[in-house]
Amino acid sequence: MNIREETKQMKLASPLLAATAMEKRNEALACIREALNAHKEEIFEANRKDLALARENHVAPAVVKRLTFNEAKLSDVTAELTSLISLPDPIGKVTLDRELDEGLRLTRVTCPIGVIGVIFEARPDALVQISSLCLKSGNCSILKGGKETTYTNRILFSLIHEAAVKAGLPEKCLLQAEQHNEIDELLECHDSVDLLIPRGSNAFVQYIMNHTSIPVLGHADGVCHMYVDKDYDIKKAIPLIIDGKTQYTATCNAVETVLVHRDIAADFLPKLADALREAGVTIRGSEEVSRLIPVEIIPEGESWHKEYLDLILAIKLVDGVDEAISHTNTYGSHHTDCIITENDETARRFMTLVDSAGVYQNASTRFADGFRYGFGAEVGISTSKIHARGPVGLEGLVSYKYKLLGHGQIVGDYASGKKKFHFRDL
């Protein structure tokens, strides 16, 4: 496949998709949902092939978990499609309406970004989420999944593309890239691809950023922190940590490090350790922590910036909220971090000074998700401060354009003083 030629064709199809009515795009999503349910046994069979190959190749259990596409995952993605259909159209929203002068009206209106290339990791359900979000927001998308789920991705893409075209969307609204060398070709398509969204390891995301002039949106990893303040409620703290660590370990919003105020450590840590061990979690910690509970000691000099994606949790003691903030900003990934406290003033300080896309008080980091935010789904979680930040849903996949409606006005009249602007918001 010639990626350059294909993306040029997608660029031509992009305005056609952007101009389709929301009803038509919603119809496509409904057709996709129907197709996934109708062909679920074929999808599961393809996924079993991928899982068998993964085990033959000694892929880590945490990764195998991410590769799985079963009845539960199908239920999740179809629920996300239903939610997405119910959301308002992100295209055509007027965010500014201003009369510059009599008969000269300026509006700012949301519009699709255009052609988006998404290179994602092992999770096959990501293909459904990404393609459906792009279609709803009127964006053409190029999808490159991991080689670990080749069979699953292939059938999912085939069903999604066929359903979208059947519903009346342009043939070139979706493209699947399967070969690894096509990634480098895609990075060079700066004249036809408007945005790249990489999802994967830190090294992979950095590679993408360093080898393209196309704008890149995304995050590298998820080293999420929870800080247990001295004014904590134990009835909240332990369930929050257990949920953040164990509810689904193989995601970027799972908690990896817990910081504990020294004043409560002797009382709190043994209770936390019992709960963690019961949940099957291996505890790593500083030498100071090891004097209070049994842990795997983290050697001095080893970085605290570590994404385990497994039933492993690091614990460190801190003097208070300011040290917790400093540690989180230094060793976290600016993804999602939480303070567990009943002191609202302390919480405000933490939530103001921690430089992350999501900052929570007394809530699990696992809430950092497009579906749980009511976005329908997400194409990923951005730790960038430009354009979109946090879970990127429909709003993060649109830009805007300015429309100026006039009646023959010329700038010369305003430059000479013959006419004057009166700038009135409507």
Protein language model features and the residues they cover:
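N-terminal Rossmann-like NAD(P)+-binding subdomain of aldehyde/semialdehyde dehydrogenases
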Residues: 1-106, 133
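C-terminal core of ALDH-fold dehydrogenases
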Residues: 27, 326, 330-426
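Aldehyde/semialdehyde dehydrogenase
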Residues: 37, 41, 181-199, 203-207, ...
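Substrate-binding/gating loop at the entrance of the active-site cleft, primarily
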Residues: 97-139, 146-156
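Solvent-exposed alpha-helices and their adjacent loops that cap or buttress functional pockets
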Residues: 97-98, 106-112, 135, 166-170, ...
